[in-house]
Amino acid sequence: MEEELKNLIKVSVSVIISISYCYYVPTRIKPGIFRFLSVLPICALFRVLPLFFASVHLSGYTALFISWLANFKLILFSFNQGPLFPLPSNLTRFICFACFPIKLQQNPKRRDYFFQWEYPIEVLFSNQFVTKVVILSVVLHMYNHIQHIYPIVLFVLYPLHLYLVLEILLKLFNAFFSIALDCELEPQLNEPYLAYSLRDFWGHWWTLMLPTILLPDVYARMRRITEGKMNSENALYLGVFVTFLVSGALHEFLFFYITRERPTGEVTLFFVLHGVCIVAYDARLKKKIARWIGFEFCPCLILQVMVMGFVVVTAGWLFFPPLVRTGKIQRFANEALLFIGFVRNLFNESLFFMRKFFNEALFFTGFVMRKLFNGALFFIGFVKLKLFNESSLFFIMRKLFNEAMFFIGFVIRKLFNEAMFFIGFVKLKLFTFGW
């Protein structure tokens, strides 16, 4: 754990310095091949950063956010395209938009909120989000009894686990950066179980950041290459197929960073299969399937069930086996449960510390109020008795001095005890979790 924390700090500093360089240096170069060459060393560095981690969460998220998304954003930025164009107004925004799966809302919706942060907070405390957090907790605990779960249930468990993790993580990112950057961000996951076709699933419901990256970088370039060499319909289908092929290869790299084993091609085949099915469905099968079912226009519910059934079955066949064989999906669950336990213990300890601090503060406030009240009564008595002779004045001064010294000593002692208690609490937590 200590080594992972050190590596996380090193990688974070490297990423911040690299993105800062991209903000100040390449922006002064004309868009095109020369700007691309100026960011190419940064892209090469980002490709190796996930290898610094042993944790599947840290290596997986670094590979997805930095090695994949940040690299593609920088490449598009080299040609004045993508989420980083136009250039964000300051370095902080540039770093956030480059390194995290967030995108500025181009046409912000008018909401009746006085503050920008009210809507993200409302989303996080909505019944829908809380329900998903509870379901994810149940799914994670099911891994403790995975040997007793039927294989057919695992076909549903793995996709559900992946969806809930991405949904919760992306919602947290959106809420945090909406508040931190004081802007409205586009949602990155849009209830994919409501999709009524594979094209709709991948283009409008699943992780929306990936299509915005792949469309201008792969699909649009493929359309330009094939322009004039084939008719527009075939060029469109070829562009879709190549986009899925590239996406499969990128996911293969992502799985390599997580499993650290030679790619088997199963993940690439998963995306190629989906690309072929989208092309075939749009080209030939759409009306035939509708007539075969008995509806010229299929009800949305039937289409949604068919789409999700196809995604779940093909994912269980091709997408998840590399993670299952290497035991990484079990490690995902174990690391998540360990982190949840750490947060829960930290929260309980923090509540204990805050309760103790509150009690001490009440006692201290009562003590001060008593001392002030006694001092006021003593002074009033002094005035009433009109003790203005020299001996009485000396007595009063000495008593006030003693009371002041006692009060100062009491305050210093209390502050010292609280500081020692807090330092001991922090040392105990760091020792408990091996930090």
Curated annotation (Swiss-Prot):
- Top-level lineage group: Eukaryota
* InterPro entries reported in the protein's UniProt record: Wax_synthase, Wax_synthase_dom
Listed GO cellular component terms? membrane
Q: Where in the cell is it found?
A: Membrane
Keywords, sorted A to Z: Acyltransferase, Lipid biosynthesis, Lipid metabolism, Membrane, Transferase, Transmembrane, Transmembrane helix
Reaction(s) catalysed by this chain's protein: a long chain fatty alcohol + a fatty acyl-CoA = a wax ester + CoA
Whether Calcium counts among this entry's keywords is no
* GO molecular function ontology, one term from the record: long-chain-alcohol O-fatty-acyltransferase activity
Enzyme Commission designation: 2.3.1.75
Record's bilayer topology term: Multi-pass membrane protein
Q: Which GO terms describe its biological process?
A: lipid metabolic process
Transmembrane stretches in the record are 7-27, 36-56, 59-79, 120-140, 149-169, 200-220, 238-258, 263-283, 300-320, 363-383, 406-426
Pfam families referenced in this protein's UniProt entry, alphabetically: MBOAT_2
- What is the annotated role of this protein in its UniProt record? Catalyzes the final step in the synthesis of long-chain linear esters (waxes).
Q: Which family does it belong to?
A: Belongs to the wax synthase family.
What protein name applies here?
A: Probable long-chain-alcohol O-fatty-acyltransferase 11
